[in-house]
Amino acid sequence: DSIQKTNYENYEIIVVDNISADNSHKICKEKFPEIKLIENKENLGYCEGNNVGIRNASGEFIVILNPDTKVEPNWLEELFNTYEKFGDGLYQPKIMAFEDNLFESGGNMLQMFGFGYSKGRGIQDKGQFDEPCEIGYASGACLFTKTNILKKIGLFDPFIFLYHDDLDLGWRARQLGIKSFYAPKSKIYHAGSYNYKWSARKFYWLERNRHYCLLTHYSKKTFYKMLPAIALI
């Protein structure tokens, strides 16, 4: 519901359903008939599911937004305002947990061994991350950019399926000279990150995709030089 309270008027909403097991797609269709609902015939994963939505979008700009988020009315306007300051790039808002005024991300950063981390995660918002700035990569929970920039980067990598998809996208963007930025006056709330419990399955996907990013984005020479350290982590 929060998206429809956005104070920016010129936008479309596209929902991509990866054969969800609950009735969420049916509820969406009944409650929000004006929304463009795309129902995939199989679970394509988070990455390719996003790509399906991107290919069906008609706007000059695009936002990738997780389904377990709530947005402030001015979220989109402030993303545009920060875009006007920095120009072409990938953008993320200030991302908060639903409870206790805790940060989920005040901007994502990338470590040389392929670990991504969020500035401020788990601490209270006291204005310490209120300045727009360049960051390592934009969070996939809410990622704003021009559609042609996203297509220039090559969309999301379907092999990744889920986890580290945003890290990979931001890494590829940086190799093309496309920077990522943090827009703190745009604010959203994200439930997922604090609800997901650690599991062997999640660890598998995170490590699989981290190593995939290292193999993909470093030269073979660099990767083999780093291999002893990678093996110890």
What is the role of each PLM region?
Residues 69-112:
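Conserved donor NDP-sugar-binding/catalytic core segment of glycosyltransferases
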Residues 2, 17-26, 42:
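A conserved acidic beta->alpha catalytic loop
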Residues 176-233:
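Active-site-adjacent helix/loop segment of glycosyltransferases
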Residues 1-10:
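Short, acidic, metal-binding catalytic loop of nucleotide-sugar glycosyltransferases
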Residues 102-105, 115-117, 123-148, 167-169, ...:
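A recurrent flexible, glycine/aromatic-enriched loop bordering the glycosyltransferase active site
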Residues 136-187:
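A short, conserved alpha-helix in the catalytic core of glycosyltransferases
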Residues 39-57, 67:
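Glycine-rich, basic loop-to-helix element that forms the pyrophosphate-binding segment
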